[in-house]
Amino acid sequence: DLIHEVGFPKGVFNLVNGDGRGVGTYLTKHPDIDLVSFTGSTRAGREILRNAADGLKKVSLELGGKGGNIIFSDADKDAVERGVRSVMLNSGQSCDAPTRMIVQREIYDEAVKKAAEVISSIAISAPSEQGDHIGPVVNQKQYDYIQGLIQKGVDEGASLIVGGTGRPNCLLYTSDAADEF
């Protein structure tokens, strides 16, 4: 409704809801679709490119996320806190979340301590509750994926500085942070 209220002609903006394998495949292969713009996983991006290739469609992809915060010793004193809080938005489920923090060695220990303090201060609760907190992840599959990533980090040599196991009964996970690995 808002699109039409601001004056866009019908057909200029179309929003199609559905799953990637069904609706996404149909749209990316359809001969009347000239351009596909997608933000999401690298796996899905590869599939879109394959589907769009036969029709020589224009494709714009924003894939994978995993942006990094690079923090040097002369950075703003609040850079670590802002970086941690940015990754926690939307319960950490934003494709543009800065999920890595690359810190100059001279301030590494201080940054780890600050990150742990900030993470420890973030409440975790149900989204129906009022207040400043993060809520559950979207579903069991995402919860299991996150738990697997945490375990992979530990298996590869990272040490958890905050957090631990999640709360599978309500798909909540503790806010984890690991040191370099």
Could you tell me what each predicted segment is?
Residues 29-30, 35, 41-175:
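ALDH superfamily catalytic-core signature
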Residues 176-181:
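A short, hydrophobic C-terminal helix/tail in secreted or cell-surface proteins
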Residues 1-24:
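PLP-dependent aminotransferase-like
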